[in-house]
Regions:
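Conserved catalytic segment of ABC-fold P-loop ATPases
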Residues: 139-140, 155-157
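Conserved catalytic-core motifs of eukaryotic protein kinase domains, centered on the activation segment
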Residues: 82-84, 154, 170-172
């Protein structure tokens, strides 16, 4: 048996301004920003993902607009397909008809699905196994707990958990939330963020706001 200390550590991951997409991922009709990453066996369809955002392995994201610095854990579902519960049948033979030799697919049904996009603001964290239903907006700085099912909009800097997801608490009190929105650090340049890395690491949110809030 080999001691753990004798095993070479993998080289540090290095991203770039070009999106990093795992070979096993499927990305179709998407726009990906700089320093973005798509993990193994993840599916992205008709989705925009802005700079620095990433999604880990085994996630499905469809019809979504994802802001900067969004953190999406594994096994997350964003905008899972809805079935026509109001029809005589819920089965997809009605809209994937070609697969069953029953004529052309129902393009209108897929347009209906597209009419409920998901919007995710900057600096959001979506935990392992969470589900975000169509038409939902998740605002800046929010946290979606692992295994949560989000069926309603989530306010800025709010932590939600459970099925259906409900607010647990705020990440910060309102003055800090407002200051963070004024600072909008997620819109800083790459060089500015790099220059201020020590403050991101060492300062509390309150101290960070005191230093960088233009109204402070």
């Amino acid at each position: 048996m080999t001691a753990a200390t004798d095993i070479d550590r993998a080289a540090p991951k290095r991203l770039s301004v070009r999106p990093t997409i795992d070979p096993s991922a499927t990305v179709r009709d998407c726009r990906l920003g700089a320093w973005t990453e798509v993990g193994a066996r993840t599916l992205l369809i008709e989705t925009a993902m802005d700079d620095y955002s990433y999604v880990v392995n085994d996630s499905d994201i469809i019809y979504a607009d994802i802001g900067k610095f969004v953190n999406i854990a594994s096994h997350v579902r964003v905008n899972p397909g809805q079935h026509p519960m109001d029809r005589a049948s819920q089965h997809h033979f009605q809209y994937r008809s070609a697969a069953y030799g029953m004529g052309a697919d129902d393009a209108g049904f897929f347009d209906w699905r597209r009419s409920f996009p998901v919007t995710i603001g900057p600096d959001v964290w979506i935990g392992h196994g969470a589900i975000v239903k169509g038409g939902v907006s998740i605002a800046t700085g929010a946290v979606i707990g692992s295994g949560a099912m989000v069926t309603k909009d989530v306010a800025p800097y709010t932590i939600v958990v459970g099925v259906p997801a409900a607010p647990l608490r705020a990440r910060f009190d309102r003055p800090i939330q407002d200051a963070m929105m004024r600072i909008a650090w997620w819109d800083w340049s790459h060089d500015r963020i790099k220059e201020r890395m020590a403050d991101f690491r060492a300062l509390s949110a309150e101290a960070f706001c005191q230093k960088y809030d233009p109204k402070a």
